Protein backbone atom coordinates (compact mmCIF):
# COMPACT_ATOMS: atom_id res chain seq x y z
CA UNK A 1 0.00 0.00 0.00
CA UNK A 2 2.78 2.44 0.94
CA UNK A 3 4.61 1.67 -2.31
CA UNK A 4 1.54 2.80 -4.23
CA UNK A 5 0.56 5.79 -2.06
CA UNK A 6 3.97 7.38 -1.62
CA UNK A 7 4.59 8.18 -5.31
CA UNK A 8 1.03 9.50 -5.62
CA UNK A 9 1.49 11.87 -2.68
CA UNK A 10 5.23 12.60 -2.79
CA UNK A 11 4.67 16.11 -4.12
CA UNK A 12 2.75 17.13 -0.99
CA UNK A 13 5.23 15.70 1.51
CA UNK A 14 7.76 18.02 3.09
CA UNK A 15 10.58 16.13 4.74
CA UNK A 16 12.21 19.25 6.18
CA UNK A 17 11.73 20.97 9.49
CA UNK A 18 8.57 23.08 9.56
CA UNK A 19 10.34 25.56 11.84
CA UNK A 20 13.36 26.03 9.61
CA UNK A 21 13.99 28.84 7.15
CA UNK A 22 13.24 26.38 4.34
CA UNK A 23 9.56 26.09 5.21
CA UNK A 24 8.37 29.64 4.37
CA UNK A 25 10.04 29.34 0.96
CA UNK A 26 8.49 25.92 0.39
CA UNK A 27 5.06 27.07 1.61
CA UNK A 28 5.12 30.03 -0.76
CA UNK A 29 6.19 27.78 -3.63
CA UNK A 30 3.22 25.51 -2.91
CA UNK A 31 0.81 28.40 -2.52
CA UNK A 32 0.23 27.69 1.17
CA UNK A 33 -0.37 30.24 3.88
CA UNK A 34 2.40 30.60 6.44
CA UNK A 35 0.64 32.23 9.37
CA UNK A 36 3.08 33.08 12.12
CA UNK A 37 0.57 33.63 14.93
CA UNK A 38 -2.66 32.09 16.12
CA UNK A 39 -4.38 35.43 15.55
CA UNK A 40 -3.27 35.36 11.91
CA UNK A 41 -4.29 31.73 11.41
CA UNK A 42 -7.74 31.65 13.04
CA UNK A 43 -9.60 33.60 10.33
CA UNK A 44 -8.71 30.86 7.84
CA UNK A 45 -11.02 28.55 9.79
CA UNK A 46 -14.04 30.59 8.71
CA UNK A 47 -12.84 31.61 5.26
CA UNK A 48 -15.21 30.98 2.36
CA UNK A 49 -12.89 28.27 1.07
CA UNK A 50 -12.80 26.47 4.43
CA UNK A 51 -16.56 26.75 4.95
CA UNK A 52 -17.19 25.37 1.46
CA UNK A 53 -14.88 22.42 2.18
CA UNK A 54 -16.47 21.74 5.57
CA UNK A 55 -20.00 21.84 4.14
CA UNK A 56 -19.11 19.83 1.03
CA UNK A 57 -17.57 17.05 3.11
CA UNK A 58 -20.25 17.22 5.80
CA UNK A 59 -17.70 17.94 8.50
CA UNK A 60 -19.20 21.19 9.81
CA UNK A 61 -21.94 23.60 8.89
CA UNK A 62 -21.13 27.28 8.54
CA UNK A 63 -22.71 27.95 11.94
CA UNK A 64 -20.67 25.17 13.58
CA UNK A 65 -17.44 26.45 12.03
CA UNK A 66 -18.23 30.00 13.17
CA UNK A 67 -18.97 28.74 16.67
CA UNK A 68 -15.64 26.86 16.83
CA UNK A 69 -13.81 29.91 15.52
CA UNK A 70 -15.47 32.11 18.15
CA UNK A 71 -14.55 29.64 20.92
CA UNK A 72 -10.92 29.36 19.76
CA UNK A 73 -10.66 33.14 19.47
CA UNK A 74 -12.12 33.66 22.94
CA UNK A 75 -9.75 31.05 24.39
CA UNK A 76 -6.74 32.69 22.72
CA UNK A 77 -7.72 36.16 23.95
CA UNK A 78 -8.31 34.94 27.51
CA UNK A 79 -4.99 33.08 27.55
CA UNK A 80 -3.08 36.10 26.27
CA UNK A 81 -4.82 38.30 28.84
CA UNK A 82 -3.77 35.95 31.63
CA UNK A 83 -0.19 35.80 30.36
CA UNK A 84 0.17 39.57 30.04
CA UNK A 85 -1.47 40.22 33.42
CA UNK A 86 0.74 37.63 35.10
CA UNK A 87 3.88 38.96 33.48
CA UNK A 88 3.23 42.54 34.60
CA UNK A 89 2.33 41.39 38.11
CA UNK A 90 5.44 39.19 38.43
CA UNK A 91 7.73 41.92 37.10
CA UNK A 92 6.29 44.45 39.56
CA UNK A 93 6.00 42.22 42.62
CA UNK A 94 8.88 39.79 42.24
CA UNK A 95 11.66 40.74 39.84
CA UNK A 96 11.87 44.51 40.18
CA UNK A 97 11.90 44.49 44.02
CA UNK A 98 14.61 41.82 44.12
CA UNK A 99 16.77 43.65 41.59
CA UNK A 100 16.23 46.94 43.44
CA UNK A 101 17.19 45.32 46.76
CA UNK A 102 20.36 43.93 45.18
CA UNK A 103 21.20 47.35 43.69
CA UNK A 104 20.76 48.85 47.17
CA UNK A 105 23.21 46.30 48.62
CA UNK A 106 25.71 47.05 45.86
CA UNK A 107 25.35 50.80 46.53
CA UNK A 108 25.97 50.27 50.26
CA UNK A 109 28.96 48.08 49.43
CA UNK A 110 30.25 50.77 47.13
CA UNK A 111 30.08 53.31 49.96
CA UNK A 112 31.99 50.92 52.23
CA UNK A 113 34.65 50.39 49.57
CA UNK A 114 34.87 54.16 48.99
CA UNK A 115 35.33 54.75 52.73
CA UNK A 116 38.09 52.14 52.80
CA UNK A 117 39.82 53.87 49.88
CA UNK A 118 39.98 50.79 47.64
CA UNK A 119 39.83 52.56 44.28
CA UNK A 120 40.35 49.42 42.14
CA UNK A 121 37.39 47.61 43.67
CA UNK A 122 35.25 50.74 43.47
CA UNK A 123 35.20 50.81 39.68
CA UNK A 124 33.99 47.21 39.46
CA UNK A 125 31.17 47.84 41.93
CA UNK A 126 30.27 51.11 40.22
CA UNK A 127 29.95 49.28 36.88
CA UNK A 128 27.70 46.68 38.50
CA UNK A 129 25.55 49.38 40.08
CA UNK A 130 25.27 51.26 36.77
CA UNK A 131 24.20 48.07 34.99
CA UNK A 132 21.56 47.37 37.65
CA UNK A 133 20.21 50.94 37.61
CA UNK A 134 20.01 50.99 33.81
CA UNK A 135 18.33 47.58 33.91
CA UNK A 136 15.75 48.75 36.44
CA UNK A 137 14.96 51.73 34.21
CA UNK A 138 14.57 49.44 31.20
CA UNK A 139 12.32 47.10 33.19
CA UNK A 140 10.16 50.02 34.36
CA UNK A 141 9.84 51.34 30.80
CA UNK A 142 9.02 47.83 29.54
CA UNK A 143 6.35 47.35 32.20
CA UNK A 144 4.74 50.67 31.25
CA UNK A 145 4.82 49.79 27.54
CA UNK A 146 3.35 46.33 28.15
CA UNK A 147 0.68 47.79 30.41
CA UNK A 148 -0.31 50.32 27.73
CA UNK A 149 -0.70 47.79 24.90
CA UNK A 150 -2.41 45.33 27.24
CA UNK A 151 -5.00 47.97 28.16
CA UNK A 152 -5.42 48.70 24.45
CA UNK A 153 -6.12 45.00 23.82
CA UNK A 154 -8.56 44.77 26.73
CA UNK A 155 -10.60 47.63 25.24
CA UNK A 156 -11.18 45.59 22.07
CA UNK A 157 -12.78 42.24 21.41
CA UNK A 158 -12.79 39.39 18.93
CA UNK A 159 -10.32 39.33 16.08
CA UNK A 160 -9.18 42.93 16.67
CA UNK A 161 -8.23 42.02 20.22
CA UNK A 162 -6.37 38.91 19.06
CA UNK A 163 -4.43 40.96 16.52
CA UNK A 164 -3.31 43.45 19.18
CA UNK A 165 -2.29 40.61 21.48
CA UNK A 166 -0.30 38.90 18.73
CA UNK A 167 1.35 41.92 17.16
CA UNK A 168 1.73 44.37 20.06
CA UNK A 169 1.36 42.61 23.43
CA UNK A 170 3.56 39.60 22.66
CA UNK A 171 6.45 41.76 21.39
CA UNK A 172 6.11 43.96 24.50
CA UNK A 173 6.21 40.82 26.64
CA UNK A 174 9.35 39.70 24.81
CA UNK A 175 10.97 43.07 25.49
CA UNK A 176 10.17 42.88 29.21
CA UNK A 177 11.42 39.30 29.38
CA UNK A 178 14.71 40.30 27.73
CA UNK A 179 15.14 43.22 30.16
CA UNK A 180 14.64 40.97 33.20
CA UNK A 181 16.80 38.18 31.76
CA UNK A 182 19.63 40.64 31.11
CA UNK A 183 20.01 41.11 34.85
Q: Language-model segments: which ranges?
A:
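Acidic, glycine-enriched catalytic cores built around paired aspartates
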Residues: 1-183
Amino acid sequence: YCKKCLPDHQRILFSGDGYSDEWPVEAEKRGLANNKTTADALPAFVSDKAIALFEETGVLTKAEAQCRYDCKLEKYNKLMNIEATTMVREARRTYRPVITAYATKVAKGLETIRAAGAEAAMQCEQNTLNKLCNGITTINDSIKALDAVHQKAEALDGQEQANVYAHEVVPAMDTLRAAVDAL
